[in-house]
Amino acid sequence: MRALALIFCMALVAGCGKSQRMCAVCDRGECKGMAFRVTLENGKVVETCCPRCALHYLETNHQQARKMEATDFATGNWVDATRAVYVSDSDVHPCATLETRQDPQGCCMMKTYDRCLPSLVAFAAKDEATVFQKGHGGQIVGFQEIPRK
């Protein structure tokens, strides 16, 4: 009986890592309410932790997207990324590590670069984005207006 319980626990733990979706760009786990999915012209689906990583993927790999879907931060549902409303550079950044390090002289702390910053949070409705922005700052933009780099 004890051996059976041990095998069950090992199988449970082994399955946990496989269910976690990993970002195709930064290798982080999927961020709650931030995931982004790109279907390329060749049919390949690329999943990223956030919209910022998806844009980075498309720009650096010179790929054309047939379809793009963002997670609506308010509901967790998939929405057409080109029709979503985004809040850029808010104080909410679930994907970023926000590490700080000392400068070469060892005295001052500085933020390290993080590909997921500035944050980019997607919403299906502008009113939800406005409520979010009032509480967390940032700029409301459409897909075509997203600041690139």
Segments the model singles out, each with a brief description of its role:
Residues 1-4:
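Positively charged n-region of N-terminal signal peptides that target proteins for export
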Residues 13-15:
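C-terminal motif of bacterial Sec signal peptides marking the signal peptidase cleavage site
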Residues 17-19:
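Bacterial signal peptide processing site
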Residues 23-26:
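Short cysteine-rich clusters marking metal-coordination/redox-active sites
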Residues 31-32:
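Short functional micro-motifs and their immediate structural scaffolds
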Residues 44-54:
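Beta-edge loop/turn motif
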Residues 52-68:
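Short metal-binding segments enriched for Cys and/or His
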Residues 77-148:
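Beta-strand-rich cores of mature extracytoplasmic or soluble domains
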